[in-house]
Amino acid sequence: MKPFLRWCFVATALTLAGCSNTSWRKSEVLAVPLQPTLQQEVILARMEQILASRALTDDERAQLLYERGVLYDSLGLRALARNDFSQALAIRPDMPEVFNYLGIYLTQAGNFDAAYEAFDSVLELDPTYNYAHLNRGIALYYGGRDKLAQDDLLAFYQDDPNDPFRSLWLYLAEQKLDEKQAKEVLKQHFEKSDKEQWGWNIVEFYLGNISEQTLMERLKADATDNTSLAEHLSETNFYLGKYYLSLGDSDSATALFKLAVANNVHNFVEHRYALLELSLLGQDQDDLAESDQQ
């Protein structure tokens, strides 16, 4: 009897596990993680050939190194990207876009003072480079300089009030100063916006207008292909992670930040700072670095 009972127990457990897994697959919204495309690989090979075989002017070489660095960055190859950016800057030290990328990497590494200097250099070289306000604002946010972060993120928001992610980052900064006032400002921004971009659904969730389930249903309905689904998931899981973190639920936040990273949308702000959030939550840096290079 004992072997028979043991077999029944195992069969029951497998059946229950199968039901559980089926239920999980039906309820979760998942995308195939983004992979390098053939076009990207061909472009990289062509860039390598040009850099190795052609006589380029300094300006041409610096620009090509920058463009290859951007492509490396989009593939999650940050060490190679940093190397190209550093080489480009050594040739042409007046490239604001290079300082911008280096500032982002310094922020991700937690080297906030150096990041501030990099973004200051961007704005000194090109005062109209508005994304430096976003990236410096994020660095100031993680560096604990909340009022300065608010100033930069407000400037970035004012440049395009119909971009929901500008409102979300401003809210995250203002939440640390006055949570009630921050939510009221977010509500005003939502009401004034044209609401055309999908990200306003995340704002609606933050305002309590819709449930998390409704948010995910809208996400799935809005995605036109796997790429847009992966991008929306990277964004949504990051801001859901920040939401749960604000409630003190670090376990849910950790899981959501990992999901944000899992889509391999390497050049999205949400992917970049999900890695930093995981680091701040005590995740192993070597594991995070390895996952980001895959």
Swiss-Prot record:
Question: From which residue to which does the signal peptide run?
Answer: 1-18
Entries under PANTHER family matching the protein? TETRATRICOPEPTIDE REPEAT PROTEIN 6, UDP-N-ACETYLGLUCOSAMINE--PEPTIDE N-ACETYLGLUCOSAMINYLTRANSFERASE SPINDLY-RELATED
Organism, by scientific name, is: Shigella boydii serotype 4 (strain Sb227)
- UniProt keyword annotations, A-Z: Cell cycle, Cell division, Cell membrane, Lipoprotein, Membrane, Palmitate, Repeat, Signal, TPR repeat
Lipid attachment residues per UniProt (S-diacylglycerol cysteine): 19
Q: What is this protein called?
A: Lipoprotein NlpI
Xref: Gene3D superfamilies: Tetratricopeptide repeat domain
Q: What is its main location?
A: membrane
